[in-house]
Structure formats: structure tokens, C-alpha cells
Amino acid sequence: MKKNIHPDYKLVIASCSCGNVIEVNSTLGCNINLDVCSNCHPAYTNKKREAATGGRVDRFKKRFSFLESSKAE
């Protein structure tokens, strides 16, 4: 490698919201905050998340349910 043409590498700490801390080398030099890492991501942990059971149709029916009750009377 040629001298004095490559950028300086600095130690960067990437901290996840789950508390996991990863140390990496980077030319940026600023710390990184992560939302998801390999310790807490469902694809890596094989944990399934519960999806929202109701959809747009359920929200619509709930919002306009007062119209059906007035028709029945």
C-alpha cells in the first residue's frame, strides 16, 4: 500500500436499542445508533412477531358501525 493516500480508520461503536454493542472500524469516526441488530432481529432469532390482525376493512366497519345501528331501528 502507498503511504499517506489511504484514509485513517477510527474505532466506531454501533449500539443497538436492545443493548448490544458492536465495535467496528470506519473512516467516518462517529458512533452509530441502530434500531435492529442480529441479536434482536426476528430473521436471526427465529422469533415470530404478531402481525396486526385487523385490516383496513375492519377499521372501516368500526368507524361506520353507527350507520348500521341506525338502519336497524
UniProtKB/Swiss-Prot annotation:
- Annotated Zn(2+) binding lies at C16, C18, C37, C40
Give the record's keywords alphabetically.
Answer: Metal-binding, Ribonucleoprotein, Ribosomal protein, RNA-binding, rRNA-binding, Zinc
Q: Which GO terms describe its molecular function?
A: metal ion binding; rRNA binding; structural constituent of ribosome
Entry's Gene Ontology BP terms: translation
Cellular-component GO terms for this entry:
ribonucleoprotein complex; ribosome
Keyword set includes Ribonucleoprotein: yes
Essential cofactor(s)? Zn(2+)
Judging by the UniProt lineage, the source's domain of life is Bacteria
Instruction: Extract the Pfam families matched here.
Output: Ribosomal_L31
TM annotation in the entry: none
InterPro entries attached to this UniProt entry = Ribosomal_bL28/bL31-like_sf (IPR034704), Ribosomal_bL31 (IPR002150), Ribosomal_bL31_A (IPR027491), Ribosomal_bL31_sf (IPR042105)
What the record notes about the co-factor is: Binds 1 zinc ion per subunit.
This protein's record includes keyword Ribosomal protein: yes
Q: What does this protein do?
A: Binds the 23S rRNA.
Family per record:
Belongs to the bacterial ribosomal protein bL31 family. Type A subfamily.
Under the subunit heading, UniProt states: Part of the 50S ribosomal subunit.
Question: Which NCBIfam families does the record cross-reference, listed alphabetically?
Answer: L31 (TIGR00105), PRK00019.1 (NF000612)
Q: What is this protein called?
A: Large ribosomal subunit protein bL31
* Underlying gene: rpmE
